[in-house]
């Protein structure tokens, strides 16, 4: 068996990626989230496939087909709630994975980091089009508001929005194409994830100390496969608790009402994992400015390798930058809270302050603190 896995053309790839892969001996549980994201992706594809067998992408029957899945399909309610809450677990793992990358300086592996940003954007696009499919009130109005933001693009904006809608409003054509996108994008994510792994295994993984670990590597199997299995068990436990005991806690009550173009909900908001970006969008009074800030709130991750002026790898030995990092995380939680609040005082003011802090922490405070740390080391 050992000779087969080392010599067989297909098994050799698996062997080099998951069995004999040289891995730093000191990587912590924060490194588990990559494998957890892979598990989340598989859960989403499998549950999504079974949902797609019963779902109809037609404005007159979409809402009823989701109700039919929950009421009449064997374990349809479980599949639907695993899929809906699986998306939340996916984004929790994704945010922690990115946060760990920033904290431990994984952005120096620029190819892996940039593919990761593409993965992040593709996952957000998949989640957005998926949220429209149940065709509830918040699905419809969320799709209308977010796609309408493209009209802020000069000259071609209005044409672009109508092209995406497939008409003059969000309707049957929009729902059909969003279903097509939602079906194909997870497979594109899978392809990008393999490229992400390919680039990672070219350079080797980072480690908590930020030091070169070439002299201290151990095989991935059995040490980290066991560690990953524990993480997967805890993830599945959390997902099952969420899906079985609190299935609707992260959803919106308005989505239990069928979509009605004549009745606007009092407060339109996306799913919780988009609220931080939505808060940044709303904090700028100008439409185009808001859209640009929304895009930059994600794309700003791409400038981390460029802003890396520190002589040390990661934040483990940099207490000043650590303070700024945790301020940034707290600020992100504030933005998430503000995104779910109505557009009125004091929420608008808090949102504007938090949005400024979000960009200031990354563009100014982190590089400045790194420069100070470099000068302290020289003393």
UniProtKB/Swiss-Prot annotation:
GO terms for cellular component: mitochondrial inner membrane; respiratory chain complex III. It is a multi-pass membrane protein. It is found in: Mitochondrion inner membrane. InterPro entries: Cyt_b/b6_C (IPR005798), Cyt_b/b6_C_sf (IPR036150), Cyt_b/b6_N (IPR005797), Cytb/b6-like_sf (IPR027387), Cytochrome_b (IPR030689), Cytochrome_b_C_euk/bac (IPR048260), Cytochrome_b_N_euk/bac (IPR048259), Di-haem_cyt_TM (IPR016174). The chain crosses the membrane at residues 33-53, 77-98, 113-133, 178-198, 226-246, 288-308, 320-340, 347-367. One of its GO terms (biological process) is mitochondrial electron transport, ubiquinol to cytochrome c. Keywords: Electron transport, Heme, Iron, Membrane, Metal-binding, Mitochondrion, Mitochondrion inner membrane, Respiratory chain, Transmembrane, Transmembrane helix, Transport, Ubiquinone. It holds the Pfam family Cytochrom_B_C. Disulfide bonds: none annotated. Heme b b566 binds at residues 97, 196. A ubiquinone binds at residue 201. Its cofactor is heme b. Heme b b562 binds at residues 83, 182. It comes from the Eukaryota. Gene3D superfamilies: Cytochrome Bc1 Complex, Chain C. GO terms for molecular function: metal ion binding; ubiquinol-cytochrome-c reductase activity. Binds 2 heme b groups non-covalently. The cytochrome bc1 complex contains 11 subunits: 3 respiratory subunits (MT-CYB, CYC1 and UQCRFS1), 2 core proteins (UQCRC1 and UQCRC2) and 6 low-molecular weight proteins (UQCRH/QCR6, UQCRB/QCR7, UQCRQ/QCR8, UQCR10/QCR9, UQCR11/QCR10 and a cleavage product of UQCRFS1). This cytochrome bc1 complex then forms a dimer. Belongs to the cytochrome b family. Component of the ubiquinol-cytochrome c reductase complex (complex III or cytochrome b-c1 complex) that is part of the mitochondrial respiratory chain. The b-c1 complex mediates electron transfer from ubiquinol to cytochrome c. Contributes to the generation of a proton gradient across the mitochondrial membrane that is then used for ATP synthesis. Heme 1 (or BL or b562) is low-potential and absorbs at about 562 nm, and heme 2 (or BH or b566) is high-potential and absorbs at about 566 nm. This is Cytochrome b. It comes from Akodon affinis (Colombian grass mouse).
């Amino acid at each position: 068996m050992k000779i087969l896995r080392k010599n067989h053309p297909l098994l050799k790839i698996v062997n080099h990626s998951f069995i004999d892969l040289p891995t730093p001996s000191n990587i912590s549980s924060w490194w588990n989230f990559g494998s957890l994201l892979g598990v989340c992706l598989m859960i989403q594809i499998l549950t999504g496939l079974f949902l797609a067998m019963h779902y109809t992408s037609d404005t007159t029957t979409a809402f009823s087909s989701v109700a039919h899945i929950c009421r009449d399909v064997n374990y349809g309610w479980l599949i639907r709630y695993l899929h809906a809450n699986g998306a939340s677990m996916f984004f929790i793992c994704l945010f922690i994975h990115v946060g760990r990358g920033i904290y431990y300086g994984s952005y120096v592996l620029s190819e892996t980091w940039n593919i990761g940003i593409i993965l992040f954007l593709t996952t957000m696009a998949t989640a957005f089009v998926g949220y429209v499919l149940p065709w509830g009130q918040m699905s419809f109005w969320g799709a209308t508001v977010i796609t309408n933001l493209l009209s802020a693009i000069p000259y071609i904006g209005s044409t672009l929005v109508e092209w995406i809608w497939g008409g003059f409003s969000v309707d049957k054509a929009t729902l059909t194409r969003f279903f097509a996108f939602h079906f194909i994008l997870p497979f594109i994510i899978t392809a990008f994830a393999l490229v992400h792994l390919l680039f990672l295994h070219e350079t080797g993984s980072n480690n908590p100390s930020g030091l070169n670990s070439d002299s201290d590597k151990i095989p991935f199997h059995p040490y980290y496969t066991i560690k990953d299995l524990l993480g997967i068990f805890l993830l599945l436990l959390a997902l099952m608790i969420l899906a079985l005991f609190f299935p609707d806690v992260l959803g919106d009550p308005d989505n239990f009402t069928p979509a009605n173009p004549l009745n606007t909900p009092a407060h339109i908001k996306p799913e919780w994992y988009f609220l931080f970006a939505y808060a940044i969008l709303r904090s700028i009074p100008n439409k185009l400015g808001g859209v640009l800030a929304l895009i930059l709130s994600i794309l700003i991750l791409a400038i981390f390798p460029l802003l890396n002026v520190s002589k040390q790898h990661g934040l483990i030995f940099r207490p000043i930058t650590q303070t700024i990092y945790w301020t940034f995380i707290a600020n992100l939680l504030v933005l998430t809270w503000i995104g779910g609040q109505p557009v009125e005082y004091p929420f608008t003011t808090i949102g504007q302050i938090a949005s400024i802090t979000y960009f200031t922490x990354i563009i100014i405070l982190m590089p400045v603190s790194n420069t100070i740390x470099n000068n302290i080391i020289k003393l």
